[in-house]
Amino acid sequence: MIRAPMLTLLCLFLVPSLADATQHTAGPPVVIKKSQVRDLSAIRSSKVLRVLVNQSRNSSGEVQGEAIGVEYRRLQAFEKYLNGHARDGQKVSLKLIPKAKDQLLAALQRGEGDLVAPGELLDASAAKYVDPTNAVVSGVPLVLVGVRGERSFKRPEQLSGRTLMLTSGSAANQAVVQLNQKLALHKLAPVKVEWVDPSLAVEDVLEMVQAGIYHLTVVEQPIAERWAKVMPKLRVDRSVALSNGDMQWFVRKDAVMLHATVDRFLETWQAPANQDVAFQKAYKDLYRVHYPLAREDRQRLEKLRPTLQRHADAQKMDWLDLAALAFKESQLNPGAKGGSGATGLLQITPSAAQRVGVGNIRDVDGNVQAASKYLAMIRRKFFSSPRINERERMAFTLAAYNLGPERVQAMRTQAKRQGLNPNQWFFQVERVAMEQVGMGVVSYVNSVNKYYLAYDQERSSLESPSQRKVVSRD
């Protein structure tokens, strides 16, 4: 896997404009003529409302027919509202187009959708030809989130010198810029921001905060409180509110009738009391990542490192991919036993080992050899296309290791039918997996990815025994 280290920036730097947003997680490119930017009459004639949604599971996720994304339910209600007010009886259906949050407004400007529903605070001040609707949720504070048992904060000024982990497009960036200006007046150190890997959404960052991999983040209070219900170790510091704004939808300036219709809908719409039942059911008992860099875990990893590195090198893999998989599968326990004969450090099955010519999977060397060869075989046979970047290639390989390569290939085919990017697992093909088989394989790939990112940020100390250290989580 090609490493994509997180970019550490002082928040006094400005974020790129929407027009220059990096296309790191976009779906397949869509070219639409300007004449196809439509108002409500054209939308009704086409019978399709194209909605650009934030690709995060928190915003637009669906698990086996159950909506878990906050925008998903609102949009379903809006679809019902539109069809209830159709004069000619023509029904309109929604087409959701998932994109990274920082790409949504630019996609709307290009005419790739009719409506943007981000599910988070989104600043549209730099976007041309875009209008915000009435508030979806009014007066939303951005609050600090840490983990229970660690230091809490009472005032924003106490964040001086601290680092916040933020997703690309986070509304917290501008709030931190303003906070740093105040800190500078008092000659205090600025708050720093680390932009997390683009494979992570806001819910992933919160999970990594709960695990202690990341220390602090800032998110919208409703999002923090929602996820704290299924991640009880999270601590929401409501007294440290960096800013306050309205969550909104967005339309093109020339879509006057659509804008008016959305505003009328939002004036009366109220979230149902049971809107999070499916969300809590999907996430309550789901696997949660742990902190993988504690002293004992580091010691175990150091003993296994030569074996992991040797076999990773033989298969042209990153040894930290194998380490992350081993932590997820067995917590680095060579004696672990699982179902269906899965054995050892990497929980390889005898049948999978036989496919790559390895007979003994009971000792560490044979187990790692079999698993690395099997992963390499999957990668080579099913996911070798140059259209798949290395990060996504590993994600597909992990999904196939867990679910079977043929099933993952079928999901890619279905993703293409649905207008998703078949060469991108994160936030694209994984949506098909959530629809078909639930959260299991999605959680599996995400967990291994998070362990990889945790290891990768400590790569130098893990690879150089003289630099080994135990990372403090204070």
Annotate each language-model stretch with its function.
Residues 76, 87-158, 222-226, 231-243, ...:
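Acidic, polar ligand-binding/catalytic clefts
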Residues 50-59, 64-85, 141-200, 295-307:
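Bilobed "Venus flytrap"/periplasmic-binding protein-like clamshell domains
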Residues 392-459:
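Catalytic and substrate-binding regions of cell-wall glycan-acting enzymes that process beta-1,4-linked
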Residues 121, 146-228, 360-368, 372-384:
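Pocket-lining segment of extracytoplasmic ligand-binding domains
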Residues 335-359, 365-377, 423-424, 448:
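Substrate-binding/active-site groove segments that recognize
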Residues 22-124, 128, 195-200, 220, ...:
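Extracytoplasmic small-molecule ligand-binding "clamshell" domains
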Residues 24-43, 69-81, 147-173, 223, ...:
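Extended ligand-binding regions for polar small-molecule ligands
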Residues 284-331, 365-368, 382-386:
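Export/targeting segments at the very N-terminus of extracytoplasmic proteins
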